[in-house]
């Protein structure tokens, strides 16, 4: 379809056609807009084994999507609800959009944070509110985030969420233009640090410190306590409902027993 070539296995024809159309009209990438007019090959792997084979087994077992910007290829593990697959597709397309726009690699935390923001993966941020490490004041730096993104599933989930918070902070600093000023400077800047200096007049180290403070203020112990409070409030409401139900049931049983006892007494009197 158009510039998009979709590769799928039997039984996937409908979703392949639908996703090919999504790719062909993909737009709205923060600070970039539409995907550059390059050919794209979308491969939908029907099984984990096939996905691992297509990605040459180089990705972690929790991976369900991969983008190869130099080749213009996106590979998805096409298993599960279509809405979840659509989010994964948007995430991988964001990788293509960013790399094609900048022309080179940028720090991993920015690449993954950008893709998470572009795909509107806000549920990742909700999980941070229950992160006990952040709640008790443990601070990760951006290198820690990069390592987490390459780690096990649990570490990677935290890494994706923290990367998204870093990109969202840069987005807020851009005002109504969002990430556009930074992304306008990135292609010409020699380094990511140079782009930050040109856009926000700060070094990457300065940004890291401000980002750490921002995370602490948003996901510190107060946020954790509030999130846990809602959880326990819900549990408490369920327990209260169960207790009230049991009391009503016991009262009904006692009433029935009392009535039976009264009838027995009447029969005896007769």
Language-model regions: role of each:
Residues 1-107, 159:
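Juxtacatalytic substrate-recognition/specificity segment
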Residues 57-88, 96, 100-232:
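Acidic/His/Gly-enriched intrinsically disordered linker/tail segments
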């Amino acid at each position: 379809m158009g510039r998009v070539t979709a590769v799928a296995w039997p039984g996937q024809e409908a979703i392949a056609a639908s996703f090919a159309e999504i790719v062909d009209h993909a737009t709205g990438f923060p600070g970039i807009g539409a995907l550059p007019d390059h050919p794209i090959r979308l491969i939908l792997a029907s099984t984990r084994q096939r996905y691992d084979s297509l990605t040459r087994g180089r990705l972690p077992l929790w991976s369900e999507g991969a983008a190869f910007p130099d080749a213009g290829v996106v590979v998805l593990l096409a298993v599960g609800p279509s809405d979840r697959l659509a989010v994964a597709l948007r995430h991988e397309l964001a990788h293509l959009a960013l790399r094609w726009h900048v022309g080179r690699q940028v720090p991993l935390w920015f690449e993954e944070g950008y893709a998470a923001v572009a795909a509107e993966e806000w549920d990742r941020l909700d999980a941070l509110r229950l992160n006990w490490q952040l709640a008790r004041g443990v601070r990760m730096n951006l290198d820690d985030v990069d390592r987490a993104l390459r780690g096990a599933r649990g570490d990677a989930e935290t890494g994706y969420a923290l990367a998204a918070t870093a990109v969202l902070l840069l987005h807020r600093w851009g005002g109504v233009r969002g990430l556009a000023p930074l992304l306008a400077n990135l292609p010409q800047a020699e380094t990511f640090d140079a782009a930050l200096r040109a856009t926000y007049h700060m070094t990457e180290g300065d940004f890291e410190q401000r980002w750490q403070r921002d995370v602490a203020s948003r996901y510190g112990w107060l946020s954790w306590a509030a999130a846990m409070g809602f959880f326990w409030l819900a549990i408490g409401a369920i327990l209260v409902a169960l207790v009230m139900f049991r009391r009503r049931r016991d009262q009904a049983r006692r009433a029935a027993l009392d009535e039976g006892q009264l009838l027995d007494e009447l029969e005896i009197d007769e």
